[in-house]
């Protein structure tokens, strides 16, 4: 699943907004109502991802440490600022208007395309080949070692990359998958000895009610 809404436009993006906390708790409450249980949890090392798991656990009515928990940077998001700097090295104003917001994501789209095709290398980031390999390794490890239900709390880039691996999508399609993943949305995979299969993508069943319509966010 993707983390709840983070603090886009703030000095510190890597923390949940108030709505992000509510989205996460609501997902946990939804799963508790459905009797959903997990045998293991794998989370990236980013603060917003770990706060999302804390909110889910609260909604489930359990302690975050009550389940086997592993943290791995392989589930971390790419550095969007580093990606943008490969195509626009000059500082950008804060994306606090619709026009600047669109410009930010136009640049990000171009930078992602170049990174994924091996035409640009953002400073401080792995190559996209290595980024994708890290995600594949997490999925392969689950196949080998984790019977039962495993919850992965990650971000849009890794989730889109995982789906792209399964569907063998080209770079542009993977970017579109990335940009359309909503906060706290669930993507479900099944796994067998032969590998993984995509069951559902980007679902928000926990927000499928009139009182939660304004809880649906992309950033």
Task: Give residue ranges: language-model regions.
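Beta-strand elements within well-structured catalytic alpha/beta cores of enzymes
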Residues: 1-2, 42, 148-154
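Phosphate-coordination/substrate-recognition cap region in phosphate-metabolizing enzymes
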Residues: 28-107
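Loop-to-helix element that buttresses phosphate recognition and phosphoryl-transfer chemistry
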Residues: 4-55, 127-132
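Short glycine/proline- and acidic residue-enriched helix-loop micro-motifs
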Residues: 93-130
């Amino acid at each position: 699943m993707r983390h709840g809404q983070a603090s886009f436009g703030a000095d510190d993006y890597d923390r949940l907004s108030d709505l992000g906390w509510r989205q996460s708790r609501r997902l946990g409450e939804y799963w508790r109502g459905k009797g959903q249980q997990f045998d293991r949890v794998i989370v990236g090392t980013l603060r917003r991802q770990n706060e999302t798991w804390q909110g889910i656990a609260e909604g489930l009515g359990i302690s975050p440490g009550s389940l086997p928990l592993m943290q791995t940077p392989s589930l971390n998001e790419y550095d969007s600022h580093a990606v943008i700097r490969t195509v626009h090295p000059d500082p950008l104003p804060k994306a606090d208007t619709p026009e600047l917001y669109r410009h930010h994501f136009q640049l990000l789209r171009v930078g992602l395309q170049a990174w994924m095709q091996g035409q640009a290398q953002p400073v401080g980031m792995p190559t996209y080949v290595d980024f994708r390999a890290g995600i594949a390794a997490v999925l392969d490890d689950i196949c080998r070692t984790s019977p039962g239900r495993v919850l992965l709390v990650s971000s849009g880039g890794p989730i889109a990359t995982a789906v792209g691996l399964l569907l063998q999508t080209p770079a542009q399609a993977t970017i579109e998958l990335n940009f359309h993943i909503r906060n706290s949305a669930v993507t479900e995979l099944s796994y067998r000895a032969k590998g993984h299969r995509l069951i559902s993508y980007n679902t928000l069943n926990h927000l499928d009610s009139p009182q939660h319509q304004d809880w649906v966010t992309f950033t």
